Amino acid sequence: MDRPLLGPVVKIDHEGKRTALFDPAAFSQLALDRADAFSPASDGGLYQIAQSGGLKPRIYVLHFSSDGSPSSTTLLDAAFEVYTFAAFAGGNFLVSGVKRDVRNKNDRGRNFTAVFSADGRELAQLSFQAPQESAKASAKKPNTNGAEKATPGLDLADAEIGSDGNLYVMRFSSPVLVYVIGPSGKIMKTMKVASPLPGALPSAFHLSGNRLALSFWNDENQRKTVVVADAQTGRKIASYADPTSLGPSFACYSANDGVFTFLKLGEGNELEVIRAEAQ
């Protein structure tokens, strides 16, 4: 499973100019081995999940200020491989990954998802019923050059905070499942979003207002399709086929403007920001 190590997170404005750099190396006292998923903080800063240690890893939540400077750290009362992470507005954290015995090479591990308090205490463990077609979906996982990769077999693949204070969390499955999870760890709602075409599988999603925008990839025709659905019911409202290459990474969605934002590397490894309007 390919994951980044200690690369920074860059915040850019609507013109693509860098406004802040969130670098986990700034927390040098933690001797981090890797830093992975990140989530916006309610104060304009950023949370990022990070790890140090080998056989007994220590899982930290790094808190950056809005200007990118290090603010604080939280040590989670847990030891597992984290792949999905998101922060609630009130300070609790949703963390999902795999627990395994690292001393046993044959241990494939088990899924583990929990909500932790702002001071690192485990508040609730969550369990999810495996979707009927999740194994098939994992076998046909879309290849998007690592830009929108969802790890096979995990409970959860992507998460964003809603205006209601709950997290909206996507599962890599067919049909797509989106869970609405409260700060206490209660699963408030489960929505199904149908794939736009046979063989199309989810690669990313974003939440804006009362709309979900999900990006699907079809290996057969190498095409991306974006589906907009109702964030309360999962009902499909519209779908948009991508006849040209908008970029592999679906970065943002604005329901009010009807604008989808994609990222890709251009010439000289410069980041290109591409915006597409719904038509």
Provide a role label for each language-model segment.
Residues 18-29, 70-76, 122-127, 141-149, ...:
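A short beta-strand motif characteristic of beta-propeller blades
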Residues 29-40, 78-89, 132-140, 149-162, ...:
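Repeated scaffold domains used in trafficking and secretory/extracellular systems
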Residues 1-4, 43-51, 92-104, 165-171, ...:
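Short beta-strand elements that form the blades of beta-propeller/WD-repeat-like
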